[in-house]
Amino acid sequence: MIQVLLVTICLAVFPYQGSSIILGSGNVNDYEVVYPRKVTALPKGAAQPKYEDTMQYEFKVNGEPVVLHLEKNKGLFSEDYSETHYSPDGREITTYPPVEDHCYYHGRIQNDADSTASISACNGLKGHFKLQGEMYLIEPLELSDSEAHAVFKYENVEKEDEAPKMCGVTQNWESYEPIKKASQLNLTPEQQRYLNTKKYIELVIVADNVMVKKYTSNSTAIRTRIYACVNTLNLIYRAFNIHIALVGIEIWSNGDLINVTSAANVTLDLFGNWRRRVLLRHKRHDNAQLLTAIDFDGPTVGLAYGASMCDPRFATGIVQDHSKLDIMVAVTMAHELGHNLGMNHDGNQCNCGGNPCIMSATLNFEPAYQFSDCSRDEHWRYLIDNRPPCILNKPSITDIVSPPVCGNYFVEVGEECDCGLPARCQNPCCNAATCKLRPGTQCEDGECCEQCQFKGAGTECRAASSECDIAESCTGQSADCPTDDFQRNGQPCLNNNGYCYNGTCPTLDDQCISFFGSSKTVAPDVCFNLNLQGQGDFYCRRENTRIFPCAPQDKKCGRLFCVLGPTGNTISCQSTYSQSDLDIGMVDLGTKCGDGRVCNSTRQCVDVNTAY
């Protein structure tokens, strides 16, 4: 990485102190006008790219000179990043725009070890930076002098609405009383290595039709809003060694694809179902958030499912576009994603070093930028107990023509490792100045990396989760654990009570226990005869509003029926259903429906040898 030696600092113009102004961020009561001067790091005669990989700007804050170092967030977009919108006649249009030469940066202030920055350099400098423990915002001024910018503290932005804003989550999903600190978890070496392994979340953001109307159908403005928020989201989650890669956005330009309502819990339920049934079928991703301009009921500005990362339906959240400031919406995104990752709301005992905490139930008027000690411990406990598999899959790295940025924590083309800037790197395996492995080392991190060396071939790196799963072992040639694999579909399991399906052993009894509790068992055949009628909620298939009854041999592949143990001469057939998710209460695919037979995707009971 090219180092720039600043011999003298020459500011173009002395800053101007202003009292009040209307900016894109809102009404600002106290601000400075500054003229950031770019210090080029390019050698003389070198070609000037539109957006350089690294940049430095000089300006004054409170009369004191500062140097802002910026590095392009190369990992912001995945290789298969896509954008989807809808034509006036309802046709789905998906494009794959080039995003390598984007204008979104992370950074720091020179000589301030605790500083951070999230900046868009698309049209001037817009974003925020932390300087000497205080949060500042910067954005261009719409003046004839195009170099003029306003710098101001967040506290000087007039609040649009003084009413409190809150997350809609009202209960915890795990009860650890008291919360065990990380030091009290008695982690095994394997668990500690797992926690230290870099995680990746491939994210899709969906903008609803109210967003389209709010931004007057300006898709560029919507994209810019999303990009800026995810750039900040990425910076926030660096504290957990998690990289957020935006793999796609979808804009409901021709109307909402679900009923987006002011009742946040209803909207979240509908969005989760739509994501599972529709979005996942045409876009691979780990997590999805709905960004809406609708005003949720009460003080709610966001809602998410808890401890649900990688789940097809529940790895979702909804966020209200409630502030003009990108950082405030980004913090709400980070909060809801935190719920997916096992974090509860912070209690009075939780500490952020005197700063606002991201997982506070109430959104502070000052933007939170840190997770509390409680959030850290809850997140680690969730990871250890649940091992969500999707976050270990590294997204594809764009084949970038321009040189990679050494020091941005993201391993890019030509790099062997990247542990951040030399002043912050704490990894003994990596040379932070060159992003190459140190002599004699083989790896930086990974489930098959220990003390900078590949683990020996045959060392187990992922235990089998069930008899239908397969334990993975290191190859001795890579730091990564091989792709998660499982026993062949159709292999008998649970003493021939089921057949393996995608690493699990689905049975009717287990599904009854899941829905109704441990005292329930599968109902007798007479209950399943209701599926032969094809009426109401009892059927095998449904196409739009038309339902199809089960054939006699397929009746145990339709609606699931359960009973509460022996009940004398009376049989009470119990079933469940959901109007918002028609698959709930149906027999799971791959379930045994007879000797040597399983339910297939069309809910037919077929020979297990031909089912897969």
Swiss-Prot record:
Name the CDD domains for this protein.
ZnMc_adamalysin_II_like (cd04269)
| Positions contributing to Ca(2+) 2 binding | V405, N408, F410, E412, E415, D418
Provide an example Pfam family for this protein. Answer: Pep_M12B_propep
Residues binding Zn(2+), per UniProt: H335, H339, H345
Instruction: Locate the residues binding Ca(2+) 1.
Output: E202, D286, C390, N393
Q: Is Secreted tagged as a keyword? A: yes
Q: What is its EC number?
A: 3.4.24.-
**Between which residues do disulfide bridges form?**
C310-C390, C350-C374, C352-C357, C406-C435, C417-C430, C419-C425, C429-C452, C443-C449, C448-C474, C461-C481, C468-C500, C493-C505, C512-C562, C527-C573, C540-C550, C557-C599, C593-C605
Propeptide residues? 21-189
Cellular compartment(s)? Secreted
Q: Which InterPro entries match?
A: ADAM_Cys-rich, Disintegrin_CS, Disintegrin_dom, Disintegrin_dom_sf, MetalloPept_cat_dom_sf, Peptidase_M12B, Peptidase_M12B_N, Reprolysin_adamalysin
Keyword Repressor present in the record's keywords: the answer is no
Name the family.
Answer: Belongs to the venom metalloproteinase (M12B) family. P-III subfamily.
Miscellaneous note, as given in the UniProt record, is: The disintegrin domain belongs to the long disintegrin subfamily.
The protein, known as: Zinc metalloproteinase-disintegrin-like 8
UniProt source species: Crotalus adamanteus (Eastern diamondback rattlesnake)
